[in-house]
């Protein structure tokens, strides 16, 4: 023990996020009182963020295998085969707590961390996406948080040189004290040149690469495993500071060294920094690790072993190197102006030993440190089943046209252009479809292939019925990829929930996970990577359950992708899928009728698969001219989005007599698409869809400058566009009154 270390007291243990029984487990495991640095290491490795101790037993139920899956969960990122010797590497991860405390730096380092996860595997990043959840617009912090987070996401991605091509932005009062910043990165690699974290070989040099270590981010992972309270602002020093230009240099240096025969294993320093990366590399390779902290490059004087082991300074890597390749490897990193230091060696001892100033500061069993964290099967109770809201029991507050104008200009449904125009979404020159559509499409260089990318979840559904909400999040990602012509291949998940020690919250988690598993199985859409973020609560008030789903699909020919914009006048508008007029948990019911209630729409996975496969086939056959899936806001909002994107109106038939008009136009039934076709193809389309028992009905024709529903007031497309595009920039400029989401 270092003479300057504090004594290990119950209060010190508790301040490290360890429960009394967890500390007793440590005492039994190592047979003595831990040193201060060892306590910090256990705190980092055994917290929720790193160990998944509350979620791991439930994550085992997710489907993770398919013939095209090269690497599933357990590595830095998932890897899927897209043919021709190419692989896609991708993952999504949260940076929620830091982004609430320090929105700009929290968001930048969230982007930087997920980019490192991808290029650590040997992939060059080609795209980023994000899912951002903010509090009610009227909350005094919301505008500041939106501005900081969006600037941070854009600032890092733009400077690093990767396009940010899509995502989600939502507002809800349940995120007032805990915003969510979920970042997804996608990269391309050679399928036979994937790099992994497991070390191999005894007495192999362990090399520190990248930027110097400072005191920023200490206990960042532990902070991410606890609730917030009124003193959360005091945790600002635990937020890391990002440097996208250093990360760009690190990327190029790593990819260059990966072209040599130098690398045995590589791991980025993310949560828990040097501790987690060193322990994982050794434990995965059944090896011990000896580190000498005197060799670690630091940017601050007098850093202790505790600080160096727990720092989460950014833009750093740890690599196990072939010993005869040291000079070659060092020359590469020096060329890029980066630190290169041999800080340790692999050993056969199965021990994690850390020295500083000639003293042994840490001597722990490495496998137990990595894999013996407590595993909890926490009590959980199912969410109460909510009654179905029958459409005929909902009195329409507004005429259909007025309701459309109101909805299209709400925080939930308005254009998020103000956000994505701050991102460089075309850098690299491979972005085929930009933000604002169903899914982004990015060209795969050196060939005709494209990737369809999306991020989706509907938290209000997950709150009302976790199982159906989990299913719907996956199904919508699958639909969005399908709507641009992609073949859905795999997902990454980012599971954001409240305090798992509350049975009702754990019940939400379990229910959503079961729904995700059911949908992934039915749609052949495996989970290959992900992240769990728990304790998203402030003063006991939790967020909406938000299991963000990042989906990746493949287009054999990116030039055959579909988009949502109406293309020409006089085309037939078809509604594919069954419409019952489901209003429970709809945006219409909440924002027009002031009722946030009812069961969400059920998800028929067989119908999702059948309808989606048919739509994708029509896209590939060149039968359809525009495609859009129907989600938030229902049929009429989707039609308005198509009209605004194309600058062309539509003449629409009245709602069928069997369904009340507001339910027909604004219900959020699932497994539905709108497509447009040439009149000459109409009969053949109906014939094909009837043969495979896919519901389809013509609902109108494109043309003119208005959305004109029979028997309703017509709405000019430009007027809709104004409301659609105005709300968010007006809000950020302080030009709109906010008293919460309208009529809530």
Curated annotation (Swiss-Prot):
List of catalytic residues: 49, 95 (proton acceptor)
Keyword flag Mitochondrion: no
GO biological process: 'de novo' IMP biosynthetic process
Source organism superkingdom: Bacteria
Magnesium among keywords: yes
Binding-site list for substrate: 94-97, 116, 240, 312-314, 533
Compartments, as annotated in UniProt: Cytoplasm
UniProt-listed Enzyme Commission number(s): 6.3.5.3
GO molecular function: ATP binding; magnesium ion binding; phosphoribosylformylglycinamidine synthase activity
Record NCBIfam families: FGAM_synth_II, PRK01213.1
Protein name in the entry: Phosphoribosylformylglycinamidine synthase subunit PurL
Native source species: Nitrobacter hamburgensis (strain DSM 10229 / NCIMB 13809 / X14)
Name of the gene encoding the protein in the UniProt record: purL
């Amino acid at each position: 023990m270092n003479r300057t270390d504090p004594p290990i007291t119950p209060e010190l243990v508790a301040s490290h996020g360890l429960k009394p029984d967890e500390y007793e487990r440590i005492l039994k495991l190592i047979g003595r009182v831990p040193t201060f640095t060892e306590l910090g290491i256990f705190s980092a490795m055994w917290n929720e963020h790193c160990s998944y101790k509350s979620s791991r037993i439930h994550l085992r139920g997710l489907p993770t295998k398919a013939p095209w899956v090269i690497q599933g969960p357990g590595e830095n990122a998932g890897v899927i085969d897209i043919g021709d010797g190419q692989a896609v590497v991708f993952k999504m991860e949260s940076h929620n707590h830091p982004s609430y405390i320090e929105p700009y730096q929290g968001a930048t380092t969230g982007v930087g961390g997920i980019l490192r996860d991808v290029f650590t595997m040997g992939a060059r990043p080609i795209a980023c996406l994000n899912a951002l959840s903010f509090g009610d617009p009227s909350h005094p912090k919301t505008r500041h948080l939106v501005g900081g987070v969006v600037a941070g996401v854009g600032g890092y991605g733009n400077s690093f040189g990767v396009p940010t091509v899509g995502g989600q932005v939502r507002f809800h009062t349940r995120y007032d004290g805990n915003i969510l910043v979920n970042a997804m990165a996608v990269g391309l690699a050679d399928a036979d040149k994937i790099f992994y974290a497991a070390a191999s070989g005894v007495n192999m040099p362990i090399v520190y690469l990248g930027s110097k270590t400072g005191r920023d981010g200490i206990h960042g992972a532990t902070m991410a495993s606890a609730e917030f309270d009124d003193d959360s602002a005091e945790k600002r020093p635990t937020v890391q500071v990002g440097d996208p230009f250093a990360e760009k240099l690190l990327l190029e240096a790593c990819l260059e060294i990966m072209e040599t025969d130098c690398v045995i294993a590589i791991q980025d320093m993310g949560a828990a920094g040097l501790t987690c990366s060193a322990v994982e590399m050794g434990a995965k390779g059944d090896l011990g690790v000896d580190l000498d902290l005197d060799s670690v490059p630091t940017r601050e004087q007098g850093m202790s072993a505790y600080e160096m082991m727990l720092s989460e300074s950014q833009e750093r890597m740890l690599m196990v190197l072939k010993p005869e390749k040291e000079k070659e490897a060092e020359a590469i990193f020096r060329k890029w102006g980066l630190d290169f230091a041999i800080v340790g060696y692999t050993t056969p001892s199965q021990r994690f030993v850390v020295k500083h100033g000639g003293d042994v500061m840490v001597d722990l069993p490495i496998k137990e440190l990595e894999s013996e964290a407590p595993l909890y099967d926490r009590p959980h109770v199912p969410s109460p089943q909510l009654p179905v809201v029958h459409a005929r029991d909902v009195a329409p507050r507004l005429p259909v046209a007025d309701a459309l104008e109101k909805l299209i200009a709400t925080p939930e449904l308005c254009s998020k252009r103000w956000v994505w125009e701050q991102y460089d979404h075309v850098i690299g020159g491979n972005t085929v479809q930009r933000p604002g559509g169903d899914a982004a499409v990015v060209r795969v260089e050196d060939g005709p292939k494209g990737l369809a990318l999306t991020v989706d979840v509907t938290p209000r559904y997950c709150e009302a019925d976790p199982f159906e909400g989990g299913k719907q999040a996956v199904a919508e990602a699958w639909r969005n990829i399908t709507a641009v012509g992609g073949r859905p291949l795999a997902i990454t998940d980012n599971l954001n929930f409240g305090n798992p020690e509350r049975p009702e919250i754990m019940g939400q988690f379990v229910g959503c996970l079961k729904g995700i598993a059911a949908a992934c199985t039915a749609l052949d859409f495996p989970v290959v990577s992900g992240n769990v973020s728990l304790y998203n609560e402030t003063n006991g008030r939790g967020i909406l359950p938000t299991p963000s789903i990042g989906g990746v699909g493949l287009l054999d020919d990116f030039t055959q992708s579909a988009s949502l914009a109406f293309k020409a006048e006089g085309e037939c508008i078809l509604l594919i899928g069954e419409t019952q007029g489901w209003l429970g948990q709809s945006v219409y019911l909440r924002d027009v009728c002031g009722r946030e209630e009812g069961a969400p729409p059920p998800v028929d996975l067989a119908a999702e698969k059948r309808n989606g496969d048919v739509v994708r086939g029509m896209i590939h056959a060149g039968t359809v001219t525009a495609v859009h899936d129907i989600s938030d806001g229902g049929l009429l909002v989707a039609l308005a989005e198509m009209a605004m994107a194309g600058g062309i109106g539509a003449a629409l038939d009245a709602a069928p007599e069997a369904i009340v008009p507001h339910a027909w136009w604004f219900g959020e039934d699932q497994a539905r698409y709108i497509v447009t076709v040439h009149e000459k193809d109409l009969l053949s389309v109906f014939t094909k869809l009837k043969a495979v028992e896919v519901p389809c009905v013509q609902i109108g024709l494109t043309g003119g400058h208005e959305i004109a529903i029979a028997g309703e007031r017509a709405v000019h497309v430009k007027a809709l566009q104004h409301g659609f595009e105005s709300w968010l920039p007006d809000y950020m400029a302080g030009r709109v009154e906010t008293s919460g989401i309208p009529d809530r």
